[in-house]
Each structure stands twice: as C-alpha cells, then as structure tokens.
Amino acid sequence: MLINAARLLLPAAALVHLSLAWATSDRCNGYSSTLIQIKHAGDIYKQPSVPGLPPPGVNPYSLIDTLLKNGEDWCKHCASPRVSVDAGRYKAQMDKLLSYAHPYSASSWDSVQSLGDALEHLCKASRKEN
C-alpha cells in the first residue's frame, strides 16, 4: 500500500516541481497549466475502458505542439535559467526533438517531468550567442 501511494505521489511531485519553477508570472503559470493538461489528457488516453478514443476536446499532442511553438517565449521568461534563443537554432532543435532521434525526443516523453526536461534542454541548446 505504501509503494502504491509513493507511485501516485511521484507524478504529483514532478508537477509541483515544475509549477514552482515556472510560477513567476501569469505567463509561466499558463505554461505550467498546459503541462498539467497534457498530463491529464495523457492519463485519460491510457484508460483501458475506451481504447483508441480520445477524450472530447482534449488532445495532448495539440497542447504539446502549442507549447513548443511558444517555446521561445517560455525560454525567455520561464526557463531555468532564462535565456534568449536564436529563432533559427530553436526551430532546428525543435525539429530534432520531434524527429525521435534525440535523447530528449518526443519518444521519451513519458511524463510531465521528461517533457519539462526536454523543454529545458531545448532552451539551452538554442541559446543566442553573445
């Protein structure tokens, strides 16, 4: 029973960690909220009762796409550390993440924490050179 409770707390702890890291403004709270929606939508998708049917009005892939497309703003205002990114480098790095041939690629996004780690990496890898 204790092990099951710990399993339930790990995703919650990851969400709290990300929420605290990004809770510096309404903008960052919006990104944090989007990640929570992605997590919730992913949980719904995994329910065995209705295999293959997405929940009405919620698409985690659409939310991830929106998050990535606004990632330059996220990097500048919410990432740790906050960085300005080069738009071309950001696009190239984002394409790598979505290519499934990268250590932080979409194929490894099995939790909100791993998605957050990928976003942090994306910001660092596309940072503007001075």
Curated annotation (Swiss-Prot):
Q: What is known of its domains?
A: The Plant immunity suppression domain is sufficient to retain the ability to suppress immunity-associated responses.
* Function noted in UniProt: Secreted effector required for full virulence of U.virens. Inhibits host pathogen-associated molecular pattern-triggered immunity including flg22- and chitin-induced defense gene expression and oxidative burst.
Spell out the residue ranges making up region: Plant immunity suppression domain. 68-85
Name used for this protein in its record? Secreted cysteine-rich effector 2
Instruction: Give all cystine bridges in this chain.
Output: none
Q: Does the keyword Signal apply?
A: yes
Q: What is the source species?
A: Ustilaginoidea virens (Rice false smut fungus)
Q: What induces it?
A: Expression is up-regulated during U.virens plant infection.
Give the record's keywords alphabetically: Host periplasm, Secreted, Signal, Virulence
Gene encoding the protein:
SCRE2
Q: Where, per UniProt, does this protein localize?
A: Secreted; Host cell; Host periplasm
Tell me if Secreted is a UniProt keyword of this record.
yes
Where is this protein chiefly located?
secreted
Q: Which residues form the signal peptide?
A: 1-23
The effect of disrupting this gene, in the record's words, is: Greatly attenuates U.virens virulence to rice.
Query: Could you state one GO cellular component term attached to this entry?
Result: extracellular region
